C-alpha cells in the first residue's frame, strides 16, 4: 500500500472521538484556531503533512498518536508496528514527539466519569462562562478553554490539581506522578548541560563504539544494563494461591474459632488472572490450600525449569499475621520461608531474574488511624472485613526480589465481600492502565500506595498503607 493510500485507509477507520483525541494531542503543532476547520482525519493528516510531521518513510508521529489513543489495531494493520514496540520506543523520553504534559491531560480525560465531568463544569462556573460549559462539552474541550484563559499550562497545574482533589483524588495522583517525572527529566537534562561539549563528544563516540548501530545500543544495551529482559512469551508463571474457606481452621484451632471465610477473594483471583494474562504470564491458580500445601506448591515451582522465562510471580490471598500467611487449616507459613525457595542457589534458572510476590493478608490486628481530611471520602456501604485478627526480613538478602504487601507491619488490610480487597483491586487496575503507558513497576506501586491510602474504613476510622519491599537492581517493566 502506497503512502497516500495508507493515510486514507487509516483516516477511514477513525471515528469522531478518535479525531477529537488526535486534535488535542496535536495542539502543540496545530493551534486551536487552525483546528476549527478540521472536520475529519483526512484534513488533520493534511495539516500534519504541511507541518512536516507526516512524511513518506517517516510515520513516527502518526504511530505515537495512534498509540496514545489506544488504536493499536491500526498500528498493526497499516503501520507494521505493535503496542509493545511503541512502549519500548517511548520509554526513552527523547523519542517522544508529543509532550508528556499533553499526554497526561489526555489520560486524565479518559479516566473521568460523566458524574465527575459534571463536577468539573460546576467547579469552573465562576471561571468560564456558562455558555462555554455546554452539556456536551468534553473534558478535552474544557482543558482547551482553561488553557485559553491561562488557567492551565505545563507550568501551571494548580487549578487543575485543586479540582481533581475535590472530584477524584486518584486523578490528583496522576498529575503528581507527572510532576515528579518532569522534575526528574529536567534534572537529568540540566546535569547533561553542565558537561563540556568535548566530554559529550567523547561520550557519544565511546557509546557508538560499543555496538554496530545506535538503534542496537538503544534497545539491547539499555535492556541488558538498566532494564530486566521481558521478551519471552509467556513471560513466566503467575501463581495465585486463593484461600477462601477457613472452616477447618475454626474446627481445629481454638484460638481461630472466630476466623471468617474470605468473602470477595474470588474477585481478586479473577482480577489477577485477567491482568497478568494480558501481560503474557502463564496463570496457575490453587484454591483453599493448607500451610503445608502452600509450601509444596512453591517447592514444585522452585524445581521447575524457568530457563525460557523472564520472571516469576506469586500472589497469595489469605488471612495472615506478622510475617506469616495462614493456610486454610489455620497453620502458619512464614513469608520469608516462602520467598526463600527462589534464591539463586535454590532456583538457578531464575537467577538474575525478577521474583515478585504479592501478599494480600493482614500483618497484625491494629487499625491504622487516618488524619481527618476536609475533602472527605465516600466509601460504598458494604461491610468491610479484615484479613485476620520486629519487622523480620520477608525476602532473602539477595538481589532481584520484590514483595508487595497489602499493609504495613502490625496492621490489618481491608476486603470488600462484594468487590474484593482494596490492595489487589487497585494493583490490578493500575497495572492495566499504566503498563501500556510504559511505567515501571515501582512507579506503579507508588501510585497504588496513594490510591489505597485515600480509602477509609468509616466504621473503625481506619486506613491502609501498602508496603513494597525490594532488592531489584534494574527497572522492571511489563510490556503489554
UniProtKB/Swiss-Prot annotation:
The modification Phosphotyrosine is found at residue 336. Its EC number is 3.4.22.61. CASP8 activity is restricted by RIPK1. (Microbial infection) Inhibited by baculovirus p35 protein P35. Signal peptide: none annotated. The keyword Secreted does not apply. Disruption phenotype: Embryonic lethality at lethality at 10.5 dpc. Embryos display impaired heart muscle development and congested accumulation of erythrocytes. Perinatal lethality observed in Ripk1 knockout mice is rescued in knockout mice lacking both Ripk1 and Casp8; mice however die the first days of postnatal life. Only mice lacking Ripk1, Ripk3 and Casp8 survive past weaning and rescue lethality caused by the absence of Ripk1. The gene is Casp8. PROSITE patterns: CASPASE_CYS, CASPASE_HIS, CASPASE_P10, CASPASE_P20, DED. It comes from the Eukaryota. SUPFAM superfamilies: Caspase-like, DEATH domain. The record marks 218-219, 374-375, 387-388 as: Cleavage. The modification Phosphoserine is found at residues 188, 213, 389. One of its GO terms (cellular component) is cytoplasm. Heterotetramer that consists of two anti-parallel arranged heterodimers, each one formed by a 18 kDa (p18) and a 10 kDa (p10) subunit. Component of the death-induced signaling complex (DISC) composed of cell surface receptor FAS/CD95 or TNFRSF1A, adapter protein FADD and the CASP8 protease; recruitment of CASP8 to the complex is required for processing of CASP8 into the p18 and p10 subunits. Component of the AIM2 PANoptosome complex, a multiprotein complex that drives inflammatory cell death (PANoptosis). Interacts with CFLAR and PEA15. It comes from Mus musculus. Its main location: cytoplasm. Thiol protease that plays a key role in programmed cell death by acting as a molecular switch for apoptosis, necroptosis and pyroptosis, and is required to prevent tissue damage during embryonic development and adulthood. Initiator protease that induces extrinsic apoptosis by mediating cleavage and activation of effector caspases responsible for FAS/CD95-mediated and TNFRSF1A-induced cell death. Cleaves and activates effector caspases CASP3, CASP4, CASP6, CASP7, CASP9 and CASP10. Binding to the adapter molecule FADD recruits it to either receptor FAS/CD95 or TNFRSF1A. This is Caspase-8. It is an enzyme of class 3 (hydrolase). One of its GO terms (molecular function) is cysteine-type endopeptidase activator activity involved in apoptotic process. Residues 1-218, 377-387 form a propeptide. Belongs to the peptidase C14A family.
Amino acid at each position: 500500500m502506497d503512502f497516500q493510500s495508507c493515510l486514507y485507509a487509516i483516516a477511514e477507520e477513525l471515528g469522531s472521538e478518535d479525531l477529537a483525541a488526535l486534535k488535542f494531542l496535536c495542539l502543540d503543532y496545530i493551534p486551536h484556531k487552525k483546528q476549527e476547520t478540521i472536520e475529519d482525519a483526512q484534513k488533520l493528516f493534511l495539516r500534519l503533512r504541511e507541518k512536516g510531521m507526516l512524511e513518506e518513510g517517516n510515520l513516527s508521529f502518526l504511530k505515537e498518536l495512534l498509540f496514545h489513543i489506544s488504536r493499536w489495531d491500526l498500528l498493526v494493520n497499516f503501520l507494521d508496528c505493535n503496542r509493545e514496540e511503541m512502549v519500548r520506543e517511548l520509554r526513552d523520553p527523547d523519542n517522544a514527539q508529543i509532550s508528556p504534559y499533553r499526554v497526561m491531560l489526555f489520560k486524565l480525560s479518559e479516566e473521568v466519569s460523566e458524574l465527575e465531568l459534571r463536577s468539573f463544569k460546576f467547579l469552573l462556573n465562576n471561571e468560564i462562562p456558562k455558555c462555554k460549559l455546554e452539556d456536551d462539552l468534553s473534558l478535552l474541550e474544557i482543558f482547551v478553554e482553561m488553557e485559553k484563559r491561562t488557567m492551565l499550562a505545563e507550568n501551571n497545574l494548580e487549578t487543575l490539581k485543586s479540582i481533581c482533589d475535590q472530584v477524584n483524588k486518584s486523578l490528583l495522583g496522576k498529575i503528581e506522578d507527572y510532576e515528579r517525572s518532569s522534575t526528574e527529566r529536567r534534572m537529568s537534562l540540566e546535569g547533561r548541560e553542565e558537561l563540556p561539549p568535548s566530554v559529550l563528544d567523547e561520550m557519544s563516540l565511546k557509546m557508538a563504539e560499543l555496538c554496530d548501530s545506535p538503534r542496537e545500543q538503544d534497545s539491547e544495551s539499555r535492556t541488558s544494563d538498566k532494564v530486566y529482559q521481558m521478551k519471552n512469551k509467556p513471560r513466566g508463571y503467575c501463581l495465585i494461591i486463593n484461600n477462601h474457606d477457613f472452616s477447618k481452621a475454626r474446627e481445629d484451632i481454638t484460638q481461630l474459632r472466630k476466623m471468617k471465610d474470605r468473602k470477595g477473594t474470588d474477585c481478586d483471583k479473577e482480577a489477577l488472572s485477567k491482568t497478568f494474562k494480558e501481560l503474557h504470564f502463564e496463570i496457575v491458580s490453587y484454591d483453599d490450600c493448607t500451610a503445608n500445601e502452600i509450601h509444596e506448591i512453591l517447592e514444585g515451582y522452585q524445581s521447575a525449569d524457568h530457563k525460557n522465562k523472564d520472571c516469576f510471580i506469586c500472589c497469595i490471598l489469605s488471612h495472615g499475621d506478622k510475617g506469616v500467611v495462614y493456610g486454610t487449616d489455620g497453620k502458619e507459613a512464614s513469608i520469608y520461608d516462602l520467598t526463600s525457595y527462589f534464591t539463586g542457589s535454590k532456583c538457578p534458572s531464575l537467577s538474575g531474574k525478577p521474583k515478585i510476590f504479592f501478599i494480600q493478608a493482614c500483618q497484625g490486628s491494629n487499625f491504622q488511624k487516618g488524619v481527618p481530611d476536609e475533602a472527605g471520602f465516600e466509601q460504598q456501604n458494604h461491610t468491610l472485613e479484615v484479613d485476620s485478627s520486629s519487622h523480620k526480613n520477608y525476602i532473602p538478602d539477595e538481589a532481584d526480589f520484590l514483595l508487595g504487601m497489602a499493609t504495613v507491619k502490625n496492621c490489618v488490610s481491608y476486603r470488600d465481600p462484594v468487590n474484593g480487597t482494596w490492595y489487589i483491586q487497585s494493583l490490578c487496575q493500575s497495572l492495566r492502565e499504566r503498563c501500556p503507558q510504559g511505567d515501571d513497576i515501582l512507579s506503579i506501586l507508588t501510585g497504588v500506595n496513594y490510591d489505597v491510602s485515600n480509602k477509609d474504613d468509616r466504621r473503625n476510622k481506619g486506613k491502609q498503607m501498602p508496603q513494597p519491599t525490594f532488592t531489584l537492581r534494574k527497572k522492571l517493566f511489563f510490556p503489554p
